[in-house]
Amino acid sequence: MSGANPARGEATLCVGDRLMTVRPSFAALVAAESETGPLLALVDRAAEGRLTLAEMEALLWHCLVDRPETMARATLGEALLAQGLGAAMPAIRAILRQALAGVQ
């Protein structure tokens, strides 16, 4: 992997021993929205500090690039807790920013 490109709205996220790229593509955001509900409502909840762990996991899961087929979703959830939710916030912010503003 060549790393995240912030100009494309990408960020990095450490999952276990892997540094992975998070890319909030249209398809990924549609998939996440089908699970979490409307993205604008999700952004509102995030702004109010009411984003749930399940919502964070869903956003990240659908936006992970080149996710190994053998990776279980629970692995992502465990990584979020192991490193602390604060470590995932740059990637979450990148996803929400992309949903609101698009790529500049």
Predicted regions, residues:
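Charged interaction scaffolds used for protein-protein
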Residues: M1-C14, L19, S34-L51, V65-Q104
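Short linear motifs in exposed loops
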Residues: R23-P24
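Short Gly/aromatic-enriched secondary-structure transition segments
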Residues: V30-A32
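Hydrophobic (often cysteine-bearing) scaffold residues that line and stabilize catalytic clefts
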Residues: T52, M56
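Short, hydrophobic/amphipathic alpha-helical patches that form generic packing surfaces
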Residues: E57-V65
